[in-house]
């Protein structure tokens, strides 16, 4: 195969403007004319990227439409890179000064001032700084809160209409605490509380004189009603009521050995007590203590039954001993 001459001249194609040597130009011209007559669809790279991913073809077309609207180039956000770089250098230098002071024992330098970015917007109500997007959301909300605290007319964020009339302003934290303290002072005094052994709160009972008198009156009315209804029966030993004992006198004492029908023993004078032996005084004192428990009036049948039961118990104990 003969090698082509590198110095051979080239000629341009009238269809695609590419250059060929004379022998190749004849072959290319016929093929290039056929390709030019065919209408090929343009290749869509967005559809190829959307296949096999979470993105949809509609999203890609939307982005391409926005790009074409802006002249084929997306607008880049303006960044204050020079200002940020200066803040970064200041922070590094301040940290180095702190490390040097800790190593040498020198006084610590003052902390660096927090620099606010120049593109931030300051809120006129709370004096805080936000970026442009956050300031659009925050400033209307902060304005509404400030008007509520001041108690003035509240303007809605959607228009210039003021909400007046039945609008009730919400109190702030300090105002709410003052209202609670005033309501507590105006109300009745709370009873003091104490803690029990288990740590639980126990409220101390404080009975007023009026409560005590009212309770006593209620008790008196109850006793009068019960005594009036059951006046015909003997209620001295009934359930829930104490027996009314007669006043004890020296002449009412009865010895245990004396019979029921026998007259009561006369009380001895101090001179008679000196003359009597000690045995008689001890027996008399014992008999007096026994009879004092029998001073209340009882039925004879009940007393006879009790004495018979005592005698039976004594006989049983003696038979067991012997």
From Swiss-Prot:
Requisite cofactors: Zn(2+)
Region (Disordered): 150-322
Zinc finger intervals, C2HC/C3H-type: 9-38, 119-148
Keyword terms: Metal-binding, Repeat, Zinc, Zinc-finger
Chain residues that bind Zn(2+) 1: 13, 16, 28, 32
InterPro entries named among the record's database cross-references: ZC2HC1A/B-like (IPR026319), Znf_C2HC_C3H (IPR049899)
Residue stretches of biased makeup (Polar residues): 150-159, 221-238, 264-274
Sequence positions that bind Zn(2+) 2: 123, 126, 138, 142
GO molecular function: zinc ion binding
Keyword DNA damage appears in the UniProt entry: no
Low complexity bias (residue ranges): 276-295, 311-322
Pfam assignment, any one: zf-C2HC_2
Bias (Basic and acidic residues) ranges: 174-220, 296-305
Family per similarity comment: Belongs to the ZC2HC1 family.
Protein name as catalogued: Zinc finger C2HC domain-containing protein zchc-1A
Gene: zchc-1A
